[in-house]
Amino acid sequence: MNDLRFAFRQFVRQPVFTIVAILALALGIGVNTAIFSVTNAVLLRALPYKNPDRIVAIDKVQTAEGIGGLIAGAYFDFREQSTAFQSFAAYGEDEYILTGAGEPERMLCAEVSPSLFSLLGIEPSLGRAFRPEEEKPGRDQVVVVSESFWQQRAGADPNFIGKTITLNDRAYTVVGIMPAQFQFPKKFEIWKPLALDPVKERHGQQFTLIQLIGRLKPGVTTAQAETELNTVWQRSKIEGPDERGTTRIQVRPLHEELVKDVRLAILVLLGAVGFVLLIACANVANLMLARAAARRREFAIRAAVGAGRGRLVRQLLTESVLLSLLGGALGLLFAVWGVDVIVSSIPAEVAGTIYGLGHIAIDRGVLLFTAGASVATGILFGLAPAISSSKLDLKTSLQSTATTSSARSGLRGTFVVLQIALTLVLLVGAGLMTRSFVRLLQVKLGFEPQHVLTVRVELPRSRYSKGPQRTQFFQQLLERLQDTPGVEAAGAISQLPLSGYSMIGRFPIEGESPTTPEEKHVPIPIGVVTPGYFAAMKIPLLQGRVFNAADRDGRPDVGLVNEAFARKYWPNENPIGKKIGAGCEKTLCRSVVGVVGDVRHEGLAQEPQPEVYTPHLQFPLNSMSLILRTDGDSMRFVSAVRLAVRELDKDQPIALVQTLEEHVSASILQPRLITTLLGIFAGLALLLAAVGVYAMMSYTIARRTGEIGIR
């Protein structure tokens, strides 16, 4: 206690030293606490399910070119033949339109096996979960809703159980309310049974792509489970597009699967802030050395009256740990602010797709980390100065003109060099990341995103079950929008660029002679577009023509290919008139009528792949993204789009309203965030290093004032 009181008095006597040291430590500990809170929520915190270490994700991995994803037939085989698992659960998601409660609203619903909730060990807080028989087609008109849905839509009415809601014009009975914190596989408002027909799924009459999880039996390892599932997979009799020779089943912990896309980014940031803390430690250690040198007479007097070396070391360590704890307390405030900044910089729709990101908080674990980091930091930066300063030559130290030992000067120089070296590492890393990000921004998109509005329209299959109904709706909608003053061009596509592909098909290509069975049907992305799409996106036409109103059902099937497709499959040949089998019941039924420029569909970092476009009039999908090129601010046309849709169908909502520039920006959210944070951390490191060098130079000059005066 005496040491603490003495340390406080010392800090009060030297306010400049105290403030500089506490601020340096607060910055170092604060950024570490902020990033650790993210790490804790996403990577370290156990999944909030029963025995989460036994829950695994099951996926199909391509060992050669092919179509990824498990089909439902495999789920039924695994469920019936596996002995390593207690249970399995399949899940997916789909868009539904909620009506009957005000304005129609698009809802993203999870479709899950009835076994999902029991597998996770989660029960509804009100009502019941799904029953096994409710996964059968025709028996699946029940839903479980989130607590937020229950509160917002039903005012938390306990009698809401048993009532119905309308999704895609079908009535679904609400049977349960999930707990407030429940989230699987991401944030959903509604869960409904995944209705599958085992016979059709196994015999090729339909192929439903699913995601699959399982709960291992006690004592079974993931390696054993993976071996068993691969055995079942290879002997499976499922009819379909999967080639057993080019695929294998992968089993890994569910937590690992949920965070795979962000793990590396978080670890990189954690390493960067670790460097910042080391620089802060070196900085304060230098200040402590300089301060200790100025107190050498005090230490000599204390030693002369009986204080041992251990007593001096203890006093100096007490001061350094106390200083670090004060810095940690201030750093905690910085961390709270930093976490808010990080979370607010991530769009809500993105945060809802990353496990744990919505639950970042300064909880007990983070507080313990901050306290531990503060104590460890205090010992780290205080130990070397304490040991160095306790080595006393009483005769020399008691002389008023005593000079600083060369050993201590060398130690201070070492700390300065360490700060500069670590700062350079961070600056180089941030510079390389910035250069990569700038190159990403300079990548040729293949289209012009300026002044373009995008809107998603998903027609419910219950009202638009036939192709002509869908084509008529989108054709009339685009005609109305095209006639809107200020709209220069209007079109639609099944999936926007930079967001993957809506379809990947296997079909023959004229001129291709497969040498192995696996190459018999080449997997190619297929985009479904309307005639005005390429003009609205300003994608160049390189050869032939684009689609027009004559390319409809009942007329010859036509298609467009991109430049990468033509270059790969028909080099040095004219692609116009070539045949492909995309979307055809008959082999090679579709004629290529044009070649368009390459567009990046899988992301700015991915090179354009060969792809095929088919006309919506011949391939009538129910879900399309509208593209409106305008003469100015495109967001001012949102009301016009909403009105045009309502005039055609009063119960049809619009969704995902954004400019194309916003869509492009969102596609590089992660590299932008990492680059920004690394730049901030490198800037902090540079600031700390500059303060350290300044302090070192100031102290050196102050100690040599007499010498400088004589000279």
Residue ranges, per PLM feature:
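Membrane-proximal extracellular/periplasmic loop immediately following the first transmembrane helix
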Residues: 47-95, 208-213, 445-506
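Interfacial "coupling" helices/loops that link adjacent transmembrane helices in transporter permeases
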Residues: 280-324, 691-711
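Short, strongly hydrophobic transmembrane alpha-helices
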Residues: 14-42, 279-281, 324-329, 412-436, ...
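Alpha-helical transmembrane segments of integral membrane proteins
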Residues: 1-18, 254-259, 287-314, 318, ...
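Mid-to-C-terminal secondary-structure elements
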Residues: 95, 109-132, 141-267, 340-345, ...
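Short coil/turn motifs that cap or connect alpha-helices
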Residues: 123, 295, 308, 393, ...
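Membrane-proximal juxtamembrane linkers immediately C-terminal to transmembrane helices
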Residues: 35-60, 82-84, 123, 184-187, ...
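Membrane-helix entry/capping segments
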Residues: 1-20, 48-49, 61, 95, ...
